[in-house]
Amino acid sequence: MSRIGNRVITVPSNVSVNQTKELLTVKGPLGQLDLKLKEGSKIKVNVENNEIRLTRGDELKQTKMLHGTYNALIKNALEGVTVGFKKELRLVGVGYRASLKDNVLNLQLGYSHPINLDIPKDLKVTVDKNTEITVSGIDKQKVGEFAIQIRKWRMPEPYKGKGVLYLNEQIIRKAGKTAEGKK
């Protein structure tokens, strides 16, 4: 039994939640998010008295999985439109730099060419000190996906600790090869 799905979600006073057939619209001070519910799912969403309750119509494995997932997605949407989400990255390495021009993030990560990433329209990206990047927005999934898209260009490596790291991330360092030659 999904315990996460049975939790009651309280809606903040400055957020409005509207439900149509298979679409849940969450509006708040930071924006609006639309959650598409799977067609034919037996999950019922009840919005009343600033509370959201999810109930499932049957005990099939698929329905049980969606029960907890929908609860988490709705909770993330409520948090996103009130507080927002952000991921902070830092560039560690000689010559690693980032800059913003118009709606393009320019990264120099030791390759022979710069990397230009188009910033999605619903995300906000800021660059501080040329080595710190902050990705923020109301959709938790999109913020995380764009942060990973930046990070995949130079994943942190364990020998020198260089790469694109999340803020406060610690890389477990490995010892390099030791000279084994003459005895």
Curated annotation (Swiss-Prot):
Sorted UniProt keywords: Ribonucleoprotein, Ribosomal protein, RNA-binding, rRNA-binding
GO molecular function: rRNA binding; structural constituent of ribosome
Keyword rRNA-binding: yes
UniProt function note: This protein binds to the 23S rRNA, and is important in its secondary structure. It is located near the subunit interface in the base of the L7/L12 stalk, and near the tRNA binding site of the peptidyltransferase center.
Domain of life: Bacteria
PANTHER family: 60S/50S RIBOSOMAL PROTEIN L6/L9, LARGE RIBOSOMAL SUBUNIT PROTEIN UL6M
Cellular component GO terms, alphabetical: cytosolic large ribosomal subunit
Disulfide bridges in this chain: none
SUPFAM superfamilies: Ribosomal protein L6
SUBUNIT field: Part of the 50S ribosomal subunit.
Gene Ontology annotations of biological process type: cytoplasmic translation
Similarity comment: family membership: Belongs to the universal ribosomal protein uL6 family.
Gene3D superfamilies: Ribosomal protein L6, alpha-beta domain (3.90.930.12)
Cross-referenced PROSITE patterns: RIBOSOMAL_L6_1 (PS00525)
Name of this chain's protein: Large ribosomal subunit protein uL6
Protein encoded by which gene: rplF
InterPro entries xref list: Ribosomal_uL6-like, Ribosomal_uL6-like_a/b-dom_sf, Ribosomal_uL6_a/b-dom, Ribosomal_uL6_bac-type, Ribosomal_uL6_CS
